[in-house]
Amino acid sequence: MLLFVYGLLRKREENHELLKGAPCVCEQAAINGVLYETDKGQPAASLAETAFVYGELYETDHQMIRKLDMYYADFDRKEVAVTTDAGNKTAFAYVVKPDQCASFSRIKSGDWKEYRFMKREDDSLVYYFAYGSCMDNARFKQAGVDHFFAEPVGGAVVEGYSTRFTLRRPDGSRADLVEDGGRTEGVLYKLPFEAATYLYKREGVDNHTYRPAFIEVCAGGRVYRGVLTFLVLDKAEEIAPPGHYQEEIERGADLYLSPAFSEKLKRYMNSLPKM
């Protein structure tokens, strides 16, 4: 029995303990709907075809569902279609009726974690995982933001994902992280929060090119949780990246990634069909 969660039941959120023992099937999942912050400061989603709500997918059982039904008694448990990188699935989700949301504040991104991330009021550092052209600093220098990225943590590993090239552009593809059970490498940066503004613009977040996501990263024998990265929204069949973009990736890979993975990534890019 699959359950889609989008708010306080997600990893590292205050009600996640209610899912103790439930295996996470997908960290990156979405349903058609609209996400809100209630007048009590809590997340609530209503079903709608006009937008997406992002969350996680878990394998649960009847006993856990009965417990959650009691906890979320003010919500309706509905069967929903869930989009994941592994294909479409059907799951339950706890949602509210649209007419209950009149006084709520809509969350434009559809992602509770991202909403909380952007609302932060402190100036704590941000950890960011780059797997494509942001492994290289050439465009950082051009934009005058290279000082933000001057002290990377270093090469890093992400389990459960693969680097793919699913974003199509007129001159070729751009990189993406796909949750397919693989293993990939990239660069982990420690940044001031203001660097997020540059990254959001570069990744085309407002244009719905990439979306922010938060993943677990291993670097230097340490696990970093809730690390910012960016995922392609409209994934297409893979084609080869253009030469100038591949050069950026290769420069970063040669500098930070393991030689074996760097070579594997180069071979993979060269194996993709050209436009």
Placement of each model-derived feature along the sequence:
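Glycine-aromatic micro-motifs
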Residues: 1-275
